[in-house]
Every structure is written in C-alpha cells, then in structure tokens.
C-alpha cells in the first residue's frame, strides 16, 4: 500500500487537507462523547465536496450506558462504546448525509473467537513474551468480549457519510460488482437497475 497511501501517526484534530475518502477504524471509541461534535466537524471539513467517509466503530444497540470498569482499567483506558443515538445527532448537526449505516451484529463475536483460538494456539509464544497474569487477562478479555458481542447488545456500526446525498449509488449493489474498485460515481446511473 505504500505506493498508494501515506500512513501518519497523529491526532485526528491535526490533520489538514481535503480528501476524497476518509476511513476511521476502531478509533471513534476513543474520541469521547464530549468531542463527537468536533470529530464529525473535522470529518466534514476534511472531506472534498463529493467525498465519502466510513466510520467503523464498536457500538451498543442499547441506549447510552457506562463502560465496564475492568475494560477501562486494563484494556482501553478512557474508551467508551457509543450508542447509535449518540453518534447520529452530531452527524446531523454537521450536515453530513448518512448515506448508509450497517450494523454488524455477530461478526465481531466471531472475530474475537478466532483471535482467542489463535492466541491459545500460540500460548507458549505469548508466555515467552508476557507473564501468566497478562496471558490470563488477555484470554479473559477475548472470551468476555466475545460473549458481550454474542449476548449483550454489542455490535459494530459502519457509518458511511458524505456531504452530498448522491455521493454513492442508491443501493449497495456497487459494492458487490467485479468493478467495485473503480470510482463509484461513474456507476450512479446504474443504481436503480
């Protein structure tokens, strides 16, 4: 990918420029509710007029709530799993179109199960790098989170956002075509077929 994009480790508030695509994966959980407005303002300001943003975040399908004290202490200090309602309002206030919202229900439970299986398959390598306490804690984290996604209303949200409501075709069909890698705006007239 190095010839197609540039990777920089920096605060999202320090990014400058204009982009045709913005992708945020696993970061929104660390922004904090008081900063959602500024976050989506940044997304809007950084998008070109016909640009598209994809915000991929762990979320809750319940109303807003608190984060597990154990997760806050040992895994994601300062992290918070947002309810969809907490993200939608600041998106609307920034006049961004939610051109698509996808909710992955059990997908991440399966991902966590695979991570646990791989961790256990490599437990001796992990123990060579980390103490037993850490290995037990990591295993507990993977199992507990899998169960949370499977039974306690944890999901993954994918918000597709744009400044213009016609930035993408009307349906998701363009995502599944063989030529999906091409500029999606070229296929707008095919959206209703």
What is each PLM-predicted segment?
Residues 174-193:
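Short, cationic low-complexity segments
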Residues 37-52:
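A short glycine-rich, Lys/Arg-flanked "PGG" loop and its adjoining helix->strand segment in the class I
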Residues 19-29, 38:
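Short SAM/SAH-binding signature in class I
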Residues 6-10, 99-102:
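General small-molecule cofactor/ligand-binding pocket signal
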Residues 8-23:
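A short acidic, Gly/Pro-enriched loop at the edge of an enzyme's catalytic core
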């Amino acid at each position: 990918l190095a010839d197609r994009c540039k990777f920089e480790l920096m605060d999202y508030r320090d990014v400058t420029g204009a982009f045709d695509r913005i992708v945020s994966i696993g970061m929104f959980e660390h922004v904090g509710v008081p900063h959602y407005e500024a976050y989506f303002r940044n997304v809007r300001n950084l998008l070109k007029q016909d640009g598209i943003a994809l915000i991929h975040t762990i979320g809750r399908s319940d109303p807003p709530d608190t984060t597990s004290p154990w997760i806050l202490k040992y895994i994601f200090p300062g992290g918070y799993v947002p309810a969809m309602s907490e993200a939608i309002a600041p998106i609307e206030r920034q006049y961004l179109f939610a051109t698509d919202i996808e909710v992955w229900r059990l997908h991440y439970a399966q991902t966590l199960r695979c991570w646990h299986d791989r961790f256990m398959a490599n437990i001796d390598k992990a123990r060579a790098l980390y103490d037993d306490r850490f290995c037990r804690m990591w295993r507990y984290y993977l199992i507990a989170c899998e169960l949370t996604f499977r039974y306690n209303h944890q999901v993954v949200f994918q918000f597709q956002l744009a400044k213009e409501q016609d930035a993408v075709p009307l349906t998701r069909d363009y995502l599944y075509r063989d030529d999906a890698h091409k500029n999606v705006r070229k296929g707008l007239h095919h959206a209703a077929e």
